[in-house]
Regions:
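Bacterial Sec-dependent N-terminal signal peptides
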Residues: 1-23, 247-254, 261, 278-279
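Processing junctions and N-termini across compartments
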Residues: 14, 30-33, 89, 314
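Hydrophobic alpha-helical segments, especially N-terminal targeting/anchoring helices
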Residues: 16, 229-230, 291, 295
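Surface-exposed coil/turn segments at beta-strand junctions on protein surfaces, enriched
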Residues: 19-21, 135-137, 152, 200-204, ...
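Local sequence-structure signature of Cys/Sec-based thiol-disulfide redox active-site neighborhoods
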Residues: 21-62
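Residue-level signal for well-ordered, solvent-exposed loop/turn and beta-edge residues enriched
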Residues: 37, 179, 234-235, 294-297, ...
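Short, conserved sequence motifs used for protein processing/export or organelle targeting and
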Residues: 48, 55-247
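C-terminal outer-membrane/trafficking sorting elements
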Residues: 253-319
Length: 319
């Protein structure tokens, strides 16, 4: 049998934003129900608008107990009710934007544009970075970095973390309004809907949440949404949603390294697989590619947002 020995060029690229203005992600929270006729008519307008603004708009749909049957409400009635009541939702559909632009109605592109642009004009005092990782078995690990740029003024600030299912599809309508497709459905809040106290002093704060995927949830559709909200006036200061660490990338430690590094792969030369370690001092979009001796790209091992930390992955030349 012919033995092949491989020696390849491995390139690590990290794109980070340094000393730039913090980007606002605008949070749209809707109350809806699978047996609500106006919801069936209005939701497509909101969903279409959101899909055209994915870069800076985040949505969570809370399913109410009324006016009729809704299995997404029944899956977590207590927390769904708590968020609906917190948002002063007394009729469906109701859409609030960043907690302080209340009850957009009717649902129109112009109304959503106006609310969105109004909030984008407000510079956020903090940023949130969320990275999700599937844990073998039945869990998701969410690593969150909260950066408070300046000391916050007086207020009651809460840091809230929620599991959201991006898409739920039924073969037949689960309620009476004919809808079979539901987007960004609220599933559960951690540790609860109250959240935890948000630090008000400028600095960087790290959080890790590991939660189980419940039986009804579709694994690949779950994403973590995190936001900071002032309970005094319900304003959302900023929000973000998780990006996933690709399968096969191991986060060795979340300890921030002293400097960026791409270690020599081992073994080298190798046949047919090798391990690659790298370190990031800041979170950013990370690309890790393998090239042959002729400069041709052989494989793209990483192409995603990663947080600061040390990582390891494997390249297998046999495919």
């Amino acid at each position: 049998m012919k033995k092949l020995i491989y020696s390849l060029l491995i390139v690590l690229t990290v794109i980070v934003t340094v000393n730039g203005q913090t980007t606002r992600k605008v949070l749209f929270e809707e109350g809806t129900n699978a047996s609500c006729g106006p919801c069936a008519a209005s939701n497509p307008i909101l969903i279409s608008w959101l899909q055209n603004h994915q870069a800076q708009a985040i949505s969570i749909m809370y399913h109410a107990s009324w006016p009729g049957t809704d299995p997404m409400y029944s899956a977590n009635p207590t927390q769904s009710t708590e968020r609906i009541q917190y948002n002063n939702i007394t009729a469906v559909p109701t859409c609030n934007v960043d907690g302080i632009i209340y009850d957009i109605w009717p649902f129109t592109v112009a109304a959503f544009d106006n609310a969105f642009n109004t909030r984008l004009a407000v510079t956020p005092p903090l940023s949130i970075d969320v990275v999700d990782q599937r844990i073998p078995g039945d869990s998701i690990k969410s690593t969150i970095t909260l950066i408070v740029n300046t000391n916050l003024p007086a207020g009651t600030y809460k840091f809230r973390v929620m599991a959201v299912e991006k898409l739920i599809t039924y073969s037949t309508p689960p309620g009476s309004n004919g809808e079979t497709v539901f987007h960004t459905v609220f599933r559960r809040a951690y540790p609860n809907t109250v959240g935890v106290d948000c630090p008000t002093t400028a600095g960087t704060y790290n959080y890790t949440y590991t939660y189980k995927r419940e039986a009804a949830w579709k694994d690949t559709s779950i994403v973590t949404v995190a936001f900071v909200q002032n309970d005094v006036n319900k304003e959302v200061l900023n929000a973000n949603k998780g990006t996933y660490i690709p399968t096969g990338i191991n986060n060795l430690t979340s300890e921030v390294p002293y400097q960026y590094s791409l270690e020599q792969n081992y073994p080298n030369p190798f046949n047919p697989s090798t391990r690659i370690k790298f370190a990031l001092t800041k979170s950013g979009f990370t690309s890790l590619k393998v090239y042959d001796a002729m400069g041709r790209e052989v494989s793209s091992l990483v192409s995603s947002q990663l947080q600061a930390g040390k990582y390891e992955t494997e390249f297998n030349a046999s495919g």
